[in-house]
């Protein structure tokens, strides 16, 4: 079985509870002496086996790291791990999932070695927002309900508002709407990408 590690939680001295996103589930497993295994870090893709335990959580066994070359680059790894942490907070408490969550991570991980990490992550996020029906397709400010003009600001969840209402940096409305439609950052300048990343860090 394969999955992405979204969170690890230390218990006792060296044991870990790990949360792993697989094709259709968010699994919670237990690993004895998990802190001794450097592979058990947020964002890692692993192959593993699950061993049932009638008294406690299922155990994580026979771990194999399915690594990527970009994991050696600290900046790419940082952005990736941050996105995985945000995704876990969004999915926490859910057990069964549509495969799009795993597939989006898998696709993004394959792109990360060749593309700008923030562009990859923002496109992943837009893909998931679109799947969840959360990409805004109406042309009004969520704070005052008045029509949006050429410039907009983004709140958590990429909800649109007037810059004067939200008191934050303005972005071009047409570019943001194109990003929502295509889930592609190709038309966005790097400064706009960085602003979207700052908004994403507020949470899913």
Language-model features, listed with the residues they occupy:
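Non-catalytic alpha-helical scaffolds and adjoining flexible linkers that form interface surfaces
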Residues: 1-14, 21-204
